[in-house]
Amino acid sequence: MVLPPKDHPRYKSLLAREKLVSASNVVAKQGLIAHGRGEAFDYLLGEQTCFPALSAIKAASSAIAAAKNPVISVNGNVVALAAREVARLSEVSGAKVEVNLFHRTPERVSGLTTMMKKVGIKALGEDADDLIPGLSSERAKCCSDGIGSADVVLVPLEDGDRCEALVNMGKKVITIDLNPLSRTAQTAHITIVDELTRCLPLLSEFIKDGKGLSDFDNKKCLSDVLKYIAERISS
């Protein structure tokens, strides 16, 4: 991996790109396109965690803390960018971690579980024995003791139809998505419109400290994010 100079004004963004490229054996090429789209929205947010996102993070903290079987669903982008942050969240919340992929191959699942093992997490995913109803082919696969039986699922950087399928299964779905207009953002119960590596440490901190928010309206939160973006652009 080629490290960008630390004095570069966009060091964190460049580092994220390098991490994705370096993990090209487990990150789908389509994931690079999705990351670039997210970066564009982060520009609009000023590359900072806005107040509506903080409210969503607190709501997510409450939901995960109250869950009986919380699961963090991770894909190639999530592991490449934030394996340590996911491990920390799993540690403080007790949530299981499951590798769940849109472009699923045994090699990618194995590679990603190995990457999570290096940060101390035994991730589920290799022995998928259950299916998510409403999805076709390989991407429907999941683990019965993970996503299959979860009551709350955190699905960062997820695609819209799988998010909708999890909601239809009766699960409480939390997502992290920089695009407040995406199907995923609009479908989830709690949408954190923030950059992955910026909000995961906050989520872990809020769970550890017992900071939460029980009264939360996702549609209003997304509307507030759009207002925040509009005000930034017009100011």
Write out the residue ranges for each language-model feature.
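Electropositive, gly/pro-rich neighborhoods at or near active sites that engage anionic ligands
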Residues: 1-95, 212-235
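Alpha-helix C-terminal capping/helix-to-coil transition sites in glycosyltransferase folds
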Residues: 66, 148-149
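Gly/Ser/Thr-rich loops at beta-strand to alpha-helix junctions
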Residues: 74-84, 103-107, 158-161
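Long, charge-dense
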Residues: 89-140
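Short, acidic/turn-prone active-site loops that include or flank metal/cofactor-
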Residues: 102-104, 178-181, 196-198
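Active-site glycine-rich loop that binds ribose-phosphate moieties when present
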Residues: 130-148, 154-161
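A short, gly/pro- and small-residue-rich
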Residues: 160-181
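C-terminal functional extensions of proteins
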Residues: 183-235
